[in-house]
Structures are given as structure tokens and as C-alpha cells.
């Protein structure tokens, strides 16, 4: 089974950090970094504060060049690069000698530029930095031969991007740069640059290399954060392999830091009852943690992912206003906006439990086991090391922690199964006796003394040897007659009410010979003074209920949601969003096809069922996901879009030569989805697919007009604008039309008014249109057309075109208000 993890070894460095600043209340720490030897802080005063990894203050490095905004320490801890608010990039050579004068060299940058990130290479003499202008530069350091004393630094610009740099990482000759719109992979050896993925984004998202220690078993990868709690997995050629979606997986309870005496067991018990929503997050920085995990953070939480399994390891909201994080091995350092620093360690639950035992913290260990009973029970059957937990049982009996012992007894039974040896079973209370039983088949058991009740251990029936004469099964507890049945009843009430469900999940029903309720009933009905015998009872098999698979339940629930939405005429996307989030794109398409069959079985026509399923899908679908789904899913979306926008009653006037739409209804369902679909096809050079969609859904011609406008194909732009017949489209396109283009538009508008002739946007041939078709919309009159033209041209140019075509303009076609606007515009 997969390991479960927790955050342990919490350290608060607040006291250590406050000592150097105790006489300087106005100075604040602004940024930090760590190495194997040091923790270093930049401050608002411009100085550097150097500590060892235990938090002991070592050295103050003064600096008079302004507050420090970013810093990074080299891998060998010899140099610290930092940037200041006054647009300086500086390097400090670490020297802890009391007699040495701190050596800092610097170079000036453009005053309008701020450094946003710094990254050292494995070579101690060079580092990269990115700035707010989008520029990435390489800094080379020079030092005296054989000494760490610096005497020069040179800056070499490498990349000029379109937005501020967010994160930089490198591996050998590869450089990875993430800015606010995209990720760039650079081969510095061949000066080759490639954008990762095709879809731009907006915001700070990080990216990093994840180099595998065993390349043959698991290849190295690049991981890029994406909007909506997604992560791209990318190979070293810059090709996106897959997208990991963690939005739904993060709808779990946050992990609490394991601290003795913190009461996390009670808090975690309450946390399980809460309903956690999916998290839509933006990760501005991602980094490697240990050899297996990816660490990310937001202002409100830490997030650890196992990308290889596409799983969330844990997330924690125990820190407030996180400013930055660093990882070192399994240790995580968290720096907050208030200037505080904390560290925690990522450990498996198993390792943490063993470490608590080794530190003689037995009661905290028992509470940890109770929080994660199922995990430890499964682990105990696999791992012999957990036999170290056995001392817990004696401690709990001595302290009379019977409830806690009952809660975790399944773990001790599993340890017995793993070790193959019998556990001593202790009596409850201070005067409890011990009944020893042999597991060997040849030995016999003594009958218990009068007043001692031996209760069958329902957890371990499958571990027992076959019964022989005089044998008793393993007992969970042996209880002297002094305590009677009340304490036994109390214990099994706990089992019946709190752990019955857990036992059913862990032990198959066929292996539980005596249910809890039968045990409980016998002790309630028996006499306190009489010796009782527990008899194996055979339960009559319950009548079989028709089995319904989880998928069938899901389909039925979706059908009920769709039916209620149909009658209430409301959107119910929030009710089925959580269901859809659990499926990959291809799986979701298959699910909807099965849902359509269910709708047909309940009386819908095949066409209506298909439309209903498409509407549910499109209400849920983010149009931007079209860029990331596979081709089959994308074609499915295109087919559904055409189906929903195809009406038998729609009146479309088509070209006489090529049957391309000329006049049509401009209403469109899911227009944004269709626009993204066209943009995808057009960007891939698949213009034929664009025209197939547009011919079926001509309301998307406004999107096509903008494509042609970008290519300066004004003939098609003007044709589409006049055919589309919406003032909003002409007003939008008119911003980019020149005076000559407006002249061409005037010419075609005159032809339209004179004879009802439209130019086909496909074949560019002229076709006649009935005047009734033209008079249905306000756009096709001179007042509307000229007022839009006046918005984008000078009054003189507009009047010149009117004068040119005045013989074709009716006398009463233009209102006085238009001429008044011309006079006001000058």
C-alpha cells in the first residue's frame, strides 16, 4: 500500500530571528534563502543577516544600497546574490572571520527594473536573474585564482520576454524560464528556445526540473504549474506529456502538524465531519521535495504532490500569510509576510510512530495510531518494524485507557499476524490477571477460573488454528469476575458504536464468526454470577439485493439532476460538477453517451437525449480546456456544438454559387465555446474544419472576420460584416479599418442598398437577396452605418465618402443628427 505522510518536528525560529533586531523595531526581514549550512535573510535596511541551520545568529553584513527584494545563496554556501529596491544586483562572498571586512560587489540595472528572481547554477561562479521587464540575464563572477575573493562581475542578457519573470531553474545545459504568460525551455548549448505548450496563461505560475535518480526506471521531467490547480508534465524536449488535475483531489481535510499535546486527535476527528470543497489554486513557485514529491504553496497553505502517482500527499493551512518556502531534503522552511520563519519535516506516519516510541512518547504515539487506525493496521501486516509498537499495549492497560486500547486493538492484532507470535493479553484494571495461551496445535489450554470471561477477538478469526477440545480463541481482554458484565458491556458498546464499520471494512464478513451484536446480547441477558459460554451462531443468509454498480448509481443521479433541471428550467451544473471532475476527458464523453442511453430508456428521443447531455457537458466545460483535450474529445465537442446550434426551422439565405451562408440568425448557444474551437483549428492551420463548423453555425462568422482582419484580408472582412448585419461587429472591426478599407465598405453597402446584393465571404461572388431579408435588422440603413463610420473616421473623410456616393443615397436617408455630429467633431 502507498505510504501516508504527516508534518512533524515543528520549529519556530521567531525568538532567534528577533535577537539581532531587538533594538531596531523598524527593520523587517523581507526575503530569505537556505543552504546546507546557513539560513540568510535580507532586510528592509539593506543588510544581510546570516544564521546557522539551527537558528543561531552568526553575522550581520551591512549594505547601503536600499532594501533587499530578492536573494539566493549558492549551492556550496560561498556566495550570496541579492537585489535591492534601487535596482542593483549584488554579490557577497561569505566569510565568517571576525577580522575580515565583508566584501560586496554590485552593478547597476535600469532604474525602472526590479529583479523578481535569482537562481544559482551548480557552478559557483554564475547565476541567472529575471526582472519585471521580462528579461533573463546571466551573471559571471571573476575571482583571484585560488581565492574566494571577488573582483568583477559581468552581466549577459539572454532572453527578452513579454512579462515579468516568475521562476528560473536549470539542469546541465537546459534553462527553464517561467513568466506571467508562458514557460520557455532553452538549450543554452545550441541557443535553441521553445515554448512549452500552446496555450498562454495570465498570472504568476512556477516551473521546475525534476531530475530522476534512476533514469531507466523513471525518466526525468519538467513540471509547470497551470491555472485551476493543474500541473503540466513535460519531457526534456519541451513536449507536454499529460496534465495533472488536483482541484478535486484537494477537497480533503488539511493535515495538521504533529505536535505532542496539541490535541490534534480531537481536531482531526472533527475535521473528518466537515465538507471540503475543491480548490482552484495558482502556484507561483514549485520545487522539488525529497526525491519523489513536488512542493507548492499559496498565501494560505502548503501543498505536497506525488506527481508520479498524480496524487495529493497532503496540504496544510497551519501557516498564515506565507511569503516564500524553501525545501532541503525532507525539511520545509516557511517564511511569512510578518517576517517569521518556521520549519517542519515531512515523514511517513510509520516513521513518525516509530520515532515517538524511540523517544518514549508512548501516549502521543497511541493517539497517532487512533487517528490513522486503518493505515497502521494495513502497514502492520506488511512491516515487521512496527513490532516496536507493542509496549503501547502494556502502557494503556496500566493507565486504564481502555477506550483508546479498544480503538487501536486491530493494529496489535495485525502486528501479531506479521510477527507470527502470540501477544500477551492483559486484564483490565489495576488488579487484572494475565491468561497465557499457546498457539501451538499440540498444547492444551487450561479452563479459566470461575468468574473470568474470555471474549472472542472478532478481529483475528482468520489467524486462529482449528479448534480442538478445550481450546479457547484469542481473547481481546480477560476480565476478572470482580468487575462483572458492566465493564464488558461498556467495552463492547464502544466496539458496536464506533468501530463496527471499520471492522467490516478490514475483515471480510465470512471471517467474522461472531458479530458484535450477538456478543453484546449474550452479556446483557446472562446472569452476572453464572459462568457463561459463548456459542458460535450461524446467521441466516440475507436475501440477495440486486447489485447496482457505482457507475449505474452515478448515471441515475445524473439523470435525476437533468430531469429536475428540465422541469425547473434552472441550471444545475453545481450539482454535477463534482461528479464530472472525477473523470478524464475521454471517460466523461463515454459517461455522457451512457447517460443518453438512460434518457432514451426513460422516454426521451435519441436526438433530445443527446442534446440534453451536450448541454450538461457544455455548461460544465471551461472553453479554454479545448486547447488541452485530446483530438477525439475535441471532435466530440465540435459535433455537439453543431448539433445544439442546428435548427430545422432556421431560415438561412445561401450563396447561389457555393451555398455558403449569406443571411442567417445570429443567435448562438455557447458562442464562447465555438470561438475557442475556431481559434484552435485556425492556429493549427485546419481552415477546412473552421469552414465546416461555420457553414453549419454561421453565427460564428464574427470570429472568422477577426481572423481575416489579422491577415489584412479586407475583402472577406467587409463581406462578413455586411452579411452578419450586427452594428456591434462593424463597430468592433471598424477600429482597425483604414480610410481606404472604409471606402470599400461604402461601395459594397451602396450595392446592398441599391439591389440587395451581398458578396459571399467564401467564394467572393455576388448573390441577390430579397429586400425583406435586408429590412429585418436596424443595421441595414444609412443612419446606423454612417454613425458607426463617423466613430472611426474624421468628419471630413466621412463626408467625402458621402459626397462620392451621394447620387445613390436617397434624400431622406440621413437624419439631421448625423450632420450635427459632423459639425461637433470638426
UniProtKB/Swiss-Prot annotation:
Keywords: Pigment, Repeat, Sensory transduction, Vision, WD repeat. Signal peptide: none annotated. The keyword Repeat applies. GO terms for cellular component: BLOC-2 complex; cytoplasm. It comes from the Eukaryota. Expressed in eye pigment granules. Pfam families: Beta-prop_HPS5, TPR_HPS5_insect. Residues 422-447 are annotated as: Disordered. Disruption phenotype: Flies exhibit defects in vesicular transport to lysosomes and therefore can alter eye color. Residues 422-446 have a biased composition (Polar residues). The keyword Repeat applies. GO terms for biological process: compound eye pigmentation; developmental pigmentation; eye pigment biosynthetic process; ommochrome biosynthetic process; protein targeting to lysosome; visual perception. WD repeats lie at residues 22-61, 63-102, 110-149. One of its GO terms (molecular function) is pigment binding. Has a role in the biogenesis of eye pigment granules. Eye pigment granules are specialized forms of late endosomes or lysosomes. Biogenesis of pigment granules in the eye requires molecular components required for protein delivery to lysosomes. Pink was the second eye color gene identified by Morgan and colleagues, mutant flies were isolated in June 1910 just 2 months after isolation of the first white mutant allele. Another mutant allele of pink, peach, was isolated by Bridges in 1913, and according to a review published by Bridges and Morgan 10 years later, these alleles represented the first case of multiple allelomorphs described for an autosomal gene in Drosophila. Belongs to the HPS5 family. This is BLOC-2 complex member HPS5 homolog. The gene is p.
Amino acid at each position: 500500500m502507498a505510504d501516508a505522510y504527516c508534518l512533524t518536528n515543528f520549529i519556530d525560529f521567531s525568538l532567534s530571528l528577533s535577537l539581532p533586531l531587538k533594538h531596531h523595531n523598524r527593520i523587517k526581514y523581507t526575503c530569505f534563502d537556505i543552504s546546507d549550512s546557513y539560513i540568510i535573510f535580507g532586510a528592509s535596511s539593506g543588510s544581510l543577516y546570516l544564521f546557522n541551520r539551527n537558528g543561531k545568529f552568526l553575522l550581520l553584513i551591512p549594505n547601503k544600497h536600499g532594501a533587499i527584494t530578492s536573494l539566493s545563496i549558492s549551492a556550496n554556501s560561498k556566495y550570496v546574490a541579492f537585489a535591492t529596491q534601487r535596482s542593483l544586483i549584488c554579490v557577497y562572498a561569505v566569510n565568517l572571520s571576525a577580522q575580515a571586512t565583508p566584501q560586496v560587489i554590485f552593478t547597476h540595472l535600469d532604474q525602472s527594473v526590479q529583479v523578481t528572481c535569482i537562481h544559482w547554477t551548480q557552478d559557483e561562479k554564475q547565476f541567472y536573474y529575471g526582472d519585471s521587464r521580462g528579461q533573463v540575464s546571466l551573471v559571471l563572477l571573476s575571482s583571484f585564482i585560488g581565492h574566494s575573493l571577488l573582483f568583477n562581475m559581468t552581466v549577459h542578457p539572454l532572453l527578452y520576454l513579454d512579462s515579468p519573470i516568475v521562476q528560473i531553474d536549470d539542469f546541465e545545459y537546459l534553462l527553464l524560464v517561467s513568466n506571467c504568460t508562458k514557460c520557455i525551455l532553452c538549450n543554452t548549448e545550441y541557443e535553441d528556445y521553445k515554448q512549452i505548450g500552446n496555450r498562454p496563461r495570465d498570472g504568476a505560475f512556477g516551473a521546475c526540473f525534476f531530475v530522476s535518480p534512476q533514469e531507466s526506471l523513471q525518466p526525468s521531467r519538467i513540471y509547470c504549474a497551470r491555472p485551476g490547480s493543474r500541473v503540466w508534465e513535460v519531457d526534456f524536449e519541451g513536449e507536454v506529456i499529460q496534465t495533472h488535475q488536483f482541484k478535486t483531489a484537494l477537497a480533503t481535510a488539511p493535515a495538521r502538524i504533529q505536535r505532542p499535546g496539541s490535541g490534534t486527535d480531537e481536531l482531526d476527528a472533527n475535521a473528518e465531519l466537515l465538507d471540503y470543497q475543491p480548490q482552484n489554486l495558482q502556484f507561483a513557485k514549485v520545487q522539488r521535495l525529497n526525491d519523489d514529491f513536488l512542493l507548492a504553496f499559496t498565501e494560505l497553505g502548503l501543498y505536497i504532490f506525488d506527481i508520479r502517482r498524480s496524487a495529493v500527499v497532503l496540504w496544510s493551512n497551519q501557516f498564515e500569510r506565507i511569503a516564500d518556502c524553501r525545501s532541503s531534503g525532507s525539511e520545509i522552511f516557511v517564511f511569512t509576510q510578518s517576517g517569521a520563519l518556521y520549519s517542519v519535516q515531512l515523514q511517513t506516519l510509520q516513521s513518525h510512530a516509530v520515532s515517538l516510541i524511540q523517544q518514549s512518547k508512548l501516549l502521543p504515539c497511541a493517539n497517532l495510531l487512533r487517528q490513522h487506525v486503518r493505515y497502521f493496521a494495513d502497514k502492520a501486516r506488511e512491516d515487521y518494524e512496527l513490532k516496536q509498537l507493542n509496549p503501547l499495549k502494556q502502557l494503556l492497560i496500566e493507565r486504564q485507557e481502555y477506550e483508546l486500547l479498544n480503538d487501536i486493538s486491530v493494529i496489535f492484532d495485525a502486528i501479531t499476524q506479521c510477527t507470527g507470535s502470540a501477544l500477551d493479553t492483559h486484564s483490565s484494571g489495576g488488579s487484572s490477571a494475565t491468561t497465557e495461551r499457546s498457539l501451538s496445535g499440540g498444547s492444551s489450554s487450561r479452563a479459566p477460573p470461575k468468574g473470568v470471561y474470555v471474549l472472542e477477538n472478532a478481529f483475528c478469526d482468520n489467524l486462529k488454528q482449528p479448534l480442538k477440545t478445550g481450546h479457547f480463541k484469542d481473547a481481546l481482554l480477560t476480565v476478572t469476575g470482580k468487575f462483572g458484565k458492566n465493564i464488558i458491556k461498556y467495552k463492547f458498546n464502544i466496539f458496536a458504536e464506533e468501530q463496527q464499520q471499520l471492522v467490516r471494512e478490514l475483515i471480510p464478513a465470512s471471517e467474522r464468526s461472531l458479530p458484535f451484536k450477538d456478543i453484546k446480547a449474550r452479556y446483557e441477558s446472562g446472569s452476572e454470577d453464572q459462568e457463561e459460554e459463548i456459542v458460535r451462531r450461524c446467521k441466516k443468509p440475507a436475501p440477495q439485493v440486486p447489485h447496482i454498480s457505482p457507475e449505474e448509481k452515478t448515471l441515475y443521479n445524473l439523470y435525476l439532476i437533468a430531469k429536475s433541471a428540465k422541469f425547473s428550467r434552472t441550471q444545475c451544473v453545481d450539482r454535477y460538477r463534482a461528479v464530472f471532475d472525477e473523470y478524464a476527458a475521454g471517460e466523461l464523453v463515454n459517461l455522457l453517451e451512457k447517460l443518453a442511453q438512460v434518457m432514451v430508456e426513460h422516454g426521451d428521443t435519441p436526438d433530445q437525449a443527446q442534446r440534453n447531455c451536450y448541454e450538461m457537458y457544455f455548461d460544465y466545460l471551461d472553453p479554454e480546456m479545448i486547447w488541452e483535450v485530446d483530438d477525439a474529445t475535441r471532435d466530440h465537442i465540435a459535433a455537439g456544438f453543431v448539433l445544439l446550434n442546428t435548427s430545422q426551422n432556421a431560415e438561412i439565405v445561401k450563396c447561389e454559387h457555393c451555398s455558403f451562408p449569406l443571411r442567417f440568425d445570429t443567435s448562438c448557444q455557447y458562442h464562447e465555446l465555438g470561438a475557442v474551437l475556431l481559434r484552435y483549428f485556425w492556429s493549427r492551420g485546419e481552415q477546412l474544419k473552421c469552414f465546416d463548423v461555420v457553414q453549419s453555425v454561421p453565427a460564428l462568422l464574427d470570429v472568422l472576420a477577426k481572423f481575416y482582419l489579422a491577415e489584412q484580408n479586407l475583402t472577406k472582412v467587409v463581406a462578413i460584416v455586411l452579411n452578419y448585419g450586427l452594428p456591434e461587429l462593424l463597430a468592433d472591426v471598424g477600429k482597425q479599418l483604414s480610410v481606404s478599407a472604409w471606402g470599400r465598405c461604402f461601395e459594397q453597402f451602396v450595392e446592398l442598398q441599391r439591389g440587395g446584393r451581398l458578396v459571399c465571404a467564401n467564394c467572393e461572388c455576388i448573390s441577390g437577396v430579397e429586400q425583406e431579408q435586408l429590412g429585418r435588422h436596424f443595421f441595414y440603413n444609412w443612419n446606423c452605418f454612417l454613425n458607426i463610420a463617423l466613430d472611426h473616421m474624421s468628419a471630413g473623410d466621412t463626408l467625402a465618402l458621402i459626397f462620392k456616393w451621394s447620387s445613390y443615397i436617397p434624400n431622406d436617408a440621413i437624419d439631421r443628427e448625423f450632420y450635427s455630429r459632423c459639425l461637433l467633431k470638426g
